[in-house]
């Protein structure tokens, strides 16, 4: 289950990219976050969307 349930506080489109509007979520699944590609082990448990690349500036 996605820990970021944007449907409770806004809208979240998890397709090719993750776009949340008016959402109070601070994290989302790697599959929903553009900064965490499917092969990114750094974000295996989730990530905070800070960028579009898989590095320390993206995930924390």
From Swiss-Prot:
Positions bound to a divalent metal cation 7: 49, 54, 58-59
UniProt: a divalent metal cation 6 binding residues: 36, 40, 43, 59
Positions of the UniProt region annotated as Alpha: 29-60
Binding positions (a divalent metal cation 3): 14, 18, 23, 28
Lineage: superkingdom: Eukaryota
Coiled-coil region: none
Binding site for a divalent metal cation 5: 33, 35-36, 49
Pfam families documented for this protein: Metallothio
Binding site for a divalent metal cation 2: 6, 12, 14, 25
PROSITE patterns for the chain: METALLOTHIONEIN_VRT (PS00203)
InterPro entries per the UniProt record, alphabetical: Metalthion_dom_sf (IPR017854), Metalthion_dom_sf_vert (IPR023587), Metalthion_vert (IPR000006), Metalthion_vert_metal_BS (IPR018064)
Binding-site residues, a divalent metal cation 1: 4, 6, 20, 23
GO MF annotation, one: metal ion binding
Residue ranges, annotated region (Beta): 1-28
Binding residues annotated for a divalent metal cation 4, in chain numbering: 32-33, 43, 47
Keywords: Metal-binding, Metal-thiolate cluster
Keyword field contains Metal-binding: yes
Entry comment, domain topic: Class I metallothioneins contain 2 metal-binding domains: four divalent ions are chelated within cluster A of the alpha domain and are coordinated via cysteinyl thiolate bridges to 11 cysteine ligands. Cluster B, the corresponding region within the beta domain, can ligate three divalent ions to 9 cysteines.
Stated family: Belongs to the metallothionein superfamily. Type 1 family.
Function: Metallothioneins have a high content of cysteine residues that bind various heavy metals.
Name of this chain's protein: Metallothionein B
Gene giving rise to this polypeptide: mtb
């Amino acid at each position: 289950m996605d820990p970021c349930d944007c449907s409770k506080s806004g809208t979240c489109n998890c397709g090719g990219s993750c776009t949340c509007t008016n959402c109070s979520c601070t994290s989302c699944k790697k599959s929903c976050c553009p900064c965490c590609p499917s092969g990114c082990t750094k974000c295996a448990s989730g990530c905070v969307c800070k960028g579009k690349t898989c590095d320390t500036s993206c995930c924390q």
